[in-house]
């Protein structure tokens, strides 16, 4: 008799059937991943790969996980945000016998305890690959090894509640695990593929400092990720989160978007299409000019604070909305964030004020003068905390890139140095091509003489690496 599978932590395993039905629906909308299974499945290019995955545990991610497994990988998974898990998706993955540790609304302590579980495999071994979103799994290994090698002063110098919890975890592991635990992890991991802008910044910082422990592929800067997921995904999912959280009429409202990168562009478009009058703030003169040329009013947060009804941060930076800004806002202004981390809004400065939880991930905060503010997802990702994240189709492009990156790193161990790389343009174009038929797109084909005239191959790539799209 086979032992019952218990290597998981989910909210309710009884949600597995519901999750499986939604996974089936999502597969229809994820042609890139399904084509990848068909093309690579017989070759089993990930056989022997043991992937530690830290990425929002959604229905779409379930399709990614099962694609990796179909290509031969063993997988352990956690969510990279305490509010982004879809519990029925996690249940379906657990019911399929895949270790997953993710609960929507988990505590920060649980979050980091679950992250530690990524690296403790049931056979006593370790992962040899990381698939990351935001860089927390990668940071776990790097900071753990730093402390293991004797540099422990930083463990007592936390700047946030989350850092305090994370550093306490490292201290505990150093006491409980055999000496050399983190060194073994670092040695065994052959590479990481990173999903998002914030995590990529961390990787480049470590590379620049000469501290990157293994090769990395920057999936975020694949064109078929950043110009689609970040832009068109946010265009659909931002207003979904605000509406589900507040039921507010968006048409006619004044909305303020901080940041006009790809996520900010998608967010501003989302609000404009909902009928909002949209303002934008920027530090980059190029992005500011882009926003102005798109017809947005470009102002500072100080200008917008007393005027706007809705505030969205999308910068990847810290302290974008300060306590002073919040004090200047209208009564019951709606404040949310769509950047990866929760420090864009100074939520910590609000802890001593009166909090009234209206429903999950929706809080009304009352200031001493009686003014109230609606905060969504405690300043964490609003589209995943208050809604279901990006639609399946756009995530198919991102996750096809992730799958190809995992194959590239695992199949070519020793080829890459401890640096950050991007996937070649030929693969970027391949990912796009896999998604065309689903939406009825018919490509024009170059004749040989036309291709020769512009100096490309008939089958592509069609653009130089420096082309910006």
UniProtKB/Swiss-Prot annotation:
GO terms for biological process: L-homocysteine biosynthetic process; one-carbon metabolic process; S-adenosylmethionine cycle. Gene3D superfamilies: Adenosylhomocysteinase-like, NAD(P)-binding Rossmann-like Domain. Keywords: Cytoplasm, Hydrolase, NAD, One-carbon metabolism. Its cofactor is NAD(+). Binds 1 NAD(+) per subunit. GO terms for molecular function: adenosylhomocysteinase activity. It is found in: Cytoplasm. It comes from the Bacteria. Pathway: Amino-acid biosynthesis; L-homocysteine biosynthesis; L-homocysteine from S-adenosyl-L-homocysteine: step 1/1. GO terms for cellular component: cytosol. Pfam families: AdoHcyase, AdoHcyase_NAD. This is Adenosylhomocysteinase. Its EC number is 3.13.2.1. The lineage of its organism: Bacteria, Pseudomonadati, Pseudomonadota, Alphaproteobacteria, Hyphomicrobiales. PROSITE patterns: ADOHCYASE_1, ADOHCYASE_2. Substrate binds at residues 58, 133, 195, 225, 229.
